[in-house]
UniProtKB/Swiss-Prot annotation:
UniProt cross-references to Gene3D superfamilies, sorted A to Z: 2.40.280.10
Family statement drawn from the similarity comment of this UniProt entry: Belongs to the SmpB family.
A single Gene Ontology CC term: cytosol
SUPFAM superfamilies (alphabetical): Small protein B (SmpB) (SSF74982)
Upper lineage: Bacteria, Pseudomonadati, Pseudomonadota, Betaproteobacteria, Rhodocyclales
One GO MF term attached to the UniProt entry: RNA binding
Cellular localization per UniProt: Cytoplasm
Full protein name: SsrA-binding protein
Keywords in alphabetical order: Cytoplasm, RNA-binding
PROSITE patterns to which the protein is assigned, alphabetical: SSRP
Broad class of the protein's primary localization: cytoplasm
Any one of the GO BP annotations: trans-translation
A Pfam family annotated for this UniProt entry: SmpB
Record InterPro entries: SmpB, SsrA-bd_prot, SsrA-bd_prot_CS
Length: 148
C-alpha cells in the first residue's frame, strides 16, 4: 500500500522500469512519513559516484519532534539498492538518455521504501495524446453506463 504517490511523474515521463529502493532516514522522518507529511512531487534522483541520492523530497517535521535535533526537511537522502541494480541504472542514465524519478513511498516489511522509475521524458504532444485517450475511455465508460 502506498503512502505517497507521485502522479505527476506518470504525466511527465514514460516509465520503462521500476525498482524498489530503501531510504536512509532519521527517526523523526519515519514518524513524519507515517503521519503522511511527506511530498515527492518536486523530488528528483541523482547519481554521485557509485551511489544514488534523492533530492527535493520534503518531509515536514511533526510538532512533537525533539528540540535537540535539528530537522532539515529537504536534506539529501541516500537510496539503498543492490550493486548490480545501481550499475545498470547508472549505465542507462549516463548513456541511454534516461532519468530516474521517484514514483511513490510505501511500506515493505515495516520499512519505508521508495519506488523509483527509469523514465524517458514525454513531449507535449505525447501528453496531449494521453489526455485524449483518458478522456475517450471516460466517455466510453459513461456511454456504457447510459446504455445499461
Amino acid at each position: 500500500m502506498s503512502i505517497i504517490d507521485n502522479r505527476k511523474a506518470y504525466h511527465d515521463y514514460f516509465i520503462e522500469e521500476k525498482y524498489e529502493a530503501g531510504l536512509v532516514l532519521e527517526g523523526w522522518e519515519v514518524k513524519a512519513i507515517r503521519a503522511g507529511r511527506a511530498n515527492i512531487k518536486e523530488a528528483y534522483i541523482i547519481v554521485r559516484g557509485e551511489e544514488i541520492f534523492i533530492l527535493g523530497m520534503h518531509i515536514t517535521p511533526l510538532a512533537s519532534a525533539s528540540t535537540h535535533i535539528r530537522t532539515d526537511p529537504t536534506r539529501t537522502r541516500k537510496l539503498l539498492l543492490h550493486g548490480a541494480e545501481i550499475a545498470r541504472l547508472i549505465g542507462k542514465v549516463e548513456r541511454a538518455g534516461f532519468t530516474l524519478v521517484p514514483l511513490d513511498l510505501h511500506y515493505a516489511k515495516g520499512r519505508v521504501k521508495a519506488e523509483i522509475g527509469l523514465a524517458k521524458g514525454k513531449k507535449q504532444y505525447d501528453k496531449r495524446e494521453d489526455e485524449k485517450k483518458r478522456d475517450w475511455e471516460r466517455e466510453k465508460q459513461r456511454l456504457m453506463r447510459v446504455k445499461a
